């Protein structure tokens, strides 16, 4: 039987999470993409702590963005999560695309975070 898009995404997500592990030296940059918004977190999996977070739901960003579901908004979140991580002394991360394909909004966020100084 053919897999649905949701089942395919869940399988990719499980496969990615099996290979990607965040540590205190190199935490995980996890990205969640919904139809309307995008969310990014820097997570230390050994302590189960979120070290930094950014999303298009935040009031200061929401007012300046035309839409939370385009590549421009994703790039803004990438820059913001990189700035917040660098403030806390985090320069290296492991990228967790969360089962999403590395394309479009996910790619825009990743490239903006790299340009802003995160290493992955």
Swiss-Prot record:
Record bears the keyword RNA-binding: yes
Species this chain originates from: Nostoc sp. (strain PCC 7120 / SAG 25.82 / UTEX 2576)
GO cellular component: cytosolic large ribosomal subunit
Family annotation (CDD domains): Ribosomal_L18_L5e
Keyword Mitochondrion: no
Domain of life: Bacteria
General function of this protein: This is one of the proteins that bind and probably mediate the attachment of the 5S RNA into the large ribosomal subunit, where it forms part of the central protuberance.
Disulphides: none
Region span, Disordered: 1-26
A molecular function GO annotation: structural constituent of ribosome
Basic and acidic residues composition-biased segments: 1-10
Protein name (Swiss-Prot/TrEMBL): Large ribosomal subunit protein uL18
């Amino acid at each position: 039987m053919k897999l649905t898009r949701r089942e395919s995404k869940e399988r990719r997500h499980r496969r990615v999470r099996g290979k990607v592990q965040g540590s205190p030296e190199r935490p995980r940059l996890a990205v969640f993409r919904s139809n309307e918004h995008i969310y990014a977190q820097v997570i230390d999996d050994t302590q189960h702590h979120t070290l930094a977070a950014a999303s298009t739901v935040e009031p200061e960003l929401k007012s300046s963005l035309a839409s939370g579901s385009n590549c421009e908004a994703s790039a803004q979140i990438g820059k913001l999560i990189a700035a917040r991580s660098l403030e806390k002394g985090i320069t290296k991360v492991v990228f967790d695309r969360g089962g999403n394909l590395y394309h479009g909004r996910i790619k825009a966020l990743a490239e903006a975070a790299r340009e802003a100084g995160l290493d992955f």
